[in-house]
Amino acid sequence: MPPVLILLTLLLPLGAGAEEIIGGHVVKPHSRPYMAFVKSVDIEGNRRYCGGFLVQDDFVLTAAHCRNRTMTVTLGAHNIKAKEETQQIIPVAKAIPHPDYNATAFFSDIMLLKLESKAKRTKAVRPLKLPRPNARVKPGDVCSVAGWGSRSINDTKASARLREAQLVIQEDEECKKRFRHYTETTEICAGDLKKIKTPFKGDSGGPLVCDNKAYGLLAYAKNRTISSGVFTKIVHFLPWISRNMKLL
């Protein structure tokens, strides 16, 4: 299978191009009610898409590198290209990236989106729980990541329907070998070296879900690598998340 050609030398922010979940499967419609589709437009009118998840009725968590001038969130979607009755499209009132976010090394790649209005909870729209402060995932644990994206590395068209892939949590030492800027305090890496089944060049900000809780946010992948991805470790940022949601 030919390698994916990427412009950046070492690391690629996952939201920089077409959204892709490599491998995986289409999920049952509206079975992931926490998923958010984040659409943004920059000052030149260029559109960008990211993933995210509903953490509270009026807050969505996503990656900081998804920030843009104008942003809207679609909740309750399965087929993002269709006008589904379950969908709720809500403008973003304020984007709050973490103050320590570093765009070069992707440190603290996490952002809260305060919605202009509260989402209405339905069977298709529900928040996802966060882990407890002392909760941890360990190497070998199987988690999942979902998003709207391509079905293979040769497919340039985004999938209209929500897809999900199962990923295995990797050893921190192995992650450090693969990712130059990897920091175990604030990051988790997950994937499967034996299978092409991982997020790659898109779906930034989508949750790494383990035991029905969000343990990570999809951040970046290594150049020419489709076997693993790095996720911002949500547990580390719980105080910041809680503090900012209370302030707004």
Curated annotation (Swiss-Prot):
Residues 21-246 form the Peptidase S1 domain. It is found in: Cytolytic granule. The active site is at residues 65, 109, 204. PROSITE patterns: TRYPSIN_DOM, TRYPSIN_HIS, TRYPSIN_SER. GO terms for biological process: killing of cells of another organism; proteolysis. Its EC number is 3.4.21.-. Residues 19-20 form a propeptide. Pfam families: Trypsin (PF00089). Disulfide bonds join 50-66, 143-210, 175-189. Glycans are attached at residues 68, 102, 154, 223. One of its GO terms (molecular function) is serine-type endopeptidase activity. The keyword Transit peptide does not apply. Gene3D superfamilies: Trypsin-like serine proteases. GO terms for cellular component: cytolytic granule. Keywords: Cytolysis, Disulfide bond, Glycoprotein, Hydrolase, Lysosome, Protease, Serine protease, Signal, Zymogen. Residues 1-18 form the signal peptide. Transmembrane segments: none annotated. CDD domains: Tryp_SPc. InterPro entries: Peptidase_S1_PA, Peptidase_S1_PA_chymotrypsin, Peptidase_S1A, Trypsin_dom, TRYPSIN_HIS, TRYPSIN_SER. Belongs to the peptidase S1 family. Granzyme subfamily. This is Granzyme E. It comes from Mus musculus (Mouse). The lineage of its organism: Eukaryota, Metazoa, Chordata, Craniata, Vertebrata.
